[in-house]
Amino acid sequence: MKKFARFIGIDDGYFVRNVHKKTKLIGAITKHTILDGVLSREITIDGDDVSEKIIDMIKNSNHYYQIRGIILYGITFAGFNIADVELIYKNLGLPIIIVMERPPKDIFYKAIEKYKPNGIELIKKAGPIYKTKTPFGYTYYQVYGIDKDTASNIINNLAIVSKIPEPARVAHMIARGVTKGDSSKPRAGGDSNPGPAG
């Protein structure tokens, strides 16, 4: 895959459970390190609409035919709104990489089993969790529609200032900035999940 190919990173905005019903879903399109476009939708807290919103957001964008892959910042969004990578790939035909700062803990899976009956099945669709070493530490990742070695190369090519690839890092900053007023605020708080980034 070309070094300057366009990728879209996707992350969700800040929310407080039992206060907010929806939050922003942000897609940041980068051409290597250059921000080339921003897409947005709203998703339901603990809902089931993130996959259809990702599909709609990308498919109806002028950038669709230029994008070479999707990088999700975690597989869960807006609480327990879990991305269905099989459905996304089937509709868009784009390889998917899910990146995490750390592997999920047992409490994450227990929470999924408790609050989202089909959640574990959706997570399993993304396959095993791998790790790749970047100049900033290990990045953990899952893949769909692409092999793990190619995904590792993409992550390292786009890990410019942190172990999170630039499209996902920028999407995270924009999402937090527009929903919380400050992109530098940490994930911990009302919008955090008991597991990997998402």
Curated annotation (Swiss-Prot):
InterPro entries the record matches: Endo_dU
Region (Disordered): 179-198
Pfam families membership: DUF99
Matching PANTHER family: UPF0215 PROTEIN MJ1150 (PTHR39518:SF2)
Family: Belongs to the UPF0215 family.
Alphabetical list of HAMAP family matching this protein: UPF0215
Protein name: UPF0215 protein NEQ431
Lineage: Archaea, Nanobdellota, Candidatus Nanoarchaeia, Nanoarchaeales, Nanoarchaeaceae
